[in-house]
UniProtKB/Swiss-Prot annotation:
The keyword Ribonucleoprotein applies. This is Large ribosomal subunit protein uL3. Residues 232-248 have a biased composition (Low complexity). It comes from Caulobacter vibrioides (strain ATCC 19089 / CIP 103742 / CB 15). GO terms for molecular function: rRNA binding; structural constituent of ribosome. Methylated by PrmB. GO terms for biological process: translation. Part of the 50S ribosomal subunit. Forms a cluster with proteins L14 and L19. One of the primary rRNA binding proteins, it binds directly near the 3'-end of the 23S rRNA, where it nucleates assembly of the 50S subunit. The modification N5-methylglutamine is found at residue 156. It holds the Pfam family Ribosomal_L3.
């Protein structure tokens, strides 16, 4: 049995959510992800680095806000400074040249993907909101502590609260991976990937999208990936010519 080639993922920008209607007329909530100049900025090889991976960068960043080290790194790759940089482990036969730009047709409709992002931070939250605790009773001796989490330990032995006890604390703003998200549609001209359901992170945040590790890769998925080589211009959007209006017919007898 030959395992499928482990391809690179992409760095996408979360634009927001909308909905579409399927053939049965049911509305499908989707999240719109944009490929904001996702380019290969580095290649890791076994001979040089001990492992095989691709370093990708996405988003525009001003040169004055980029460190000298990263500015030189991007200049060596002949790409503009990137806002976000991330690595994706790939197989040796899935390496892509530096400077290539990943396109939306890297994924196909119906494919399962895993999406990793940083959840929306909600600040300090109580146990009921953070851990879905039921709280204390509304009456019968309970005063002020209706939303408290209750006991935090045992007795004199062990005489302490165990690490990891679910208590009030900071909620959100943590790295989360959503598995087996379905790709609803891809728009190559606009560089958009539409996936069913919600994606971790707020609007404008960057997420990492890769092939699902627990599902088989579709046979029509491009290998090693869909990309434009360095210096290759993006295809222009097809323009539909305007239809000419039919000329008005003049009836006989009219001047």
């Amino acid at each position: 049995m030959t395992l499928p080639t482990q391809r690179t993922g992409v760095i996408a920008k979360k634009l927001g959510m909308t909905r579409f209607f399927d053939e049965a007329g049911q509305h499908v909530p989707v999240t719109v992800l944009s490929l904001d100049g996702c380019q290969v900025t580095g290649v890791r090889t076994v001979e040089k680095d001990g492992y095989t991976a691709l370093q990708l960068g996405a988003g525009a960043k001003k040169a004055k806000n980029t460190s000298n080290a990263m500015r030189g790194h991007f200049a060596k790759a002949a790409v503009e400074p990137k806002r976000v940089v991330a690595e994706f482990r790939v197989e040796e036969n899935a390496l892509i040249e530096v400077g290539a730009e990943l396109t939306a047709d890297h994924f196909v409709a119906g494919q399962k993907v895993d999406i990793q992002g940083v959840t929306v931070g909600k600040g300090f939250a109580g146990a009921m909101k953070r851990w879905n605790f039921g709280g204390l009773r509304a009456t019968h001796g309970v005063s002020v502590s209706h939303r408290s989490h209750g006991s935090t330990g045992n007795r004199q032995d062990p005489g302490r609260t165990f690490p990891g006890k679910k208590m009030a604390g900071h909620l959100g703003q943590e790295t989360v991976t959503t598995l087996n998200v379905t790709v609803w549609k891809v728009d190559v001209e606009r560089g958009l990937i539409l996936v069913k359901g919600a994606v971790p992170g707020h609007e404008g945040s960057y997420v990492k999208v890769r092939d699902a590790v627990k599902k088989a890769l579709p046979a029509d998925a491009p290998r090693p990936g869909a990309f434009r080589k360095a210096g290759e211009a993006a295809p222009a959007a097809a323009e539909t010519p305007a239809e000419e209006a039919p000329a008005a017919e003049t009836e006989e007898g009219e001047g």
